[in-house]
Amino acid sequence: MEVKTIMLLFQILAISTLKQGSAHVPDGYVEENVALRGRATQSAQLRGEHAALAHASNAIDGNRDSNYHHGSCTHTEGANPWWRVDLLQVYTIASVTITNRGDCCGERISGARILIGNSLENNGINNPQCSVIGSLATGETRTFHCPQPMIGRYVTVYLPKIESLQLCEVEVNALLPVN
């Protein structure tokens, strides 16, 4: 436990030297997609004919293919949907990269919030906000930088409206010390 605490303190020290809004990776650190190591879940999975293609884990499979029917995207149902990855440990997160669905419905993601923190209260929706997806073109991949690096275990994408949430890839870019 001591080693983890010391590493976390070094990460906090490193990020405290960053300017707010900076995308700079501090010396001695690298950015790595830690979502690949995590476990994904979502508010409700699409039902019906294409339900087998809609699993939450599809958004962290390392595949940016934006065609839903190729089996690498997730799809929710219901009002105010959310998708979440449990990173299984706490990381210092600089940004989140999202790949939007490309074969249709790209406008649905508009207004989604990217939330990062250590709480599962309200399914992670009460965690601090990293960014808001104002709009994202159909099939587009874009990186959303947090105003400053954030510390958290859970990354939630929450869509506060009556619409389905469809994500083809979610990459959580954490700052890791170079070994």
Swiss-Prot record:
Highest rank taxon of the organism: Eukaryota
Intervals of motif Cell attachment site: 101-103
Chain residues that bind alpha-L-fucose: 75, 101, 108
Repeat among keywords: no
UniProt subcellular location: Secreted
Entry keyword 4Fe-4S: no
GO biological process, one term: regulation of cellular defense response
Location (main, coarse): secreted
Region (F5/8 type C-like) residue spans: 31-179
Signal peptide extent: 1-23
Entry keyword set: Calcium, Disulfide bond, Lectin, Metal-binding, Secreted, Signal
Binding annotation for Ca(2+): 58, 61, 63, 72, 168-169
UniProt cross-references to InterPro entries, sorted A to Z: BG_Antigen-Binding_Lectin, FTP1, Galactose-bd-like_sf
Tissues showing expression: Gill mucous cells.
Annotated GO CC locations: extracellular space
Gene Ontology molecular function, alphabetical: calcium ion binding; carbohydrate binding; fucose binding
Pfam families, per the entry: F5_F8_type_C_2
Disulfide bonds: 73-168, 104-105, 130-146
Note: Binds 1 calcium ion per monomer.
Quaternary structure, from the entry: Homotrimer.
Physiological role: Acts as a defensive agent. Recognizes blood group fucosylated oligosaccharides including A, B, H and Lewis B-type antigens. Does not recognize Lewis A antigen and has low affinity for monovalent haptens.
Family from the record: Belongs to the fucolectin family.
The protein's name: Fucolectin-4
Species: Anguilla japonica (Japanese eel)
